[in-house]
């Protein structure tokens, strides 16, 4: 469930997890050449950070749970320019864990994507408890 977008830099008490190192998303003019986004209903690519955005930049999106008692959320970011995710580049599968048990739609999990000249980063925060959440790369390459 997507609910709100917040632009700007965020202070983090933990280092964000690297989504993509040596990313080709940034062009010579220090702007993004592709969009960074997520998959929405029907395999549609929904851009969060659009091409032409000056870097460094950050974007936060607030997610919630779809089921009662859900303790984790899967986030699959993509980069590209096509309207369908199947034609864009998947950047991995990231499991956000440690969400407190609550009725669906109650937890507020802020996921922040940051693009620097060299990297794309992801971090997550439980807005209710004001606490950073743990993120696992599903293929086991990294853990925050």
Q: What is each residue range found by the language model?
A:
Residues 1-5:
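Bacterial N-terminal signal peptides
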Residues 9-12:
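Bacterial signal peptide processing site
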Residues 14-144:
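Acidic low-complexity intrinsically disordered segments
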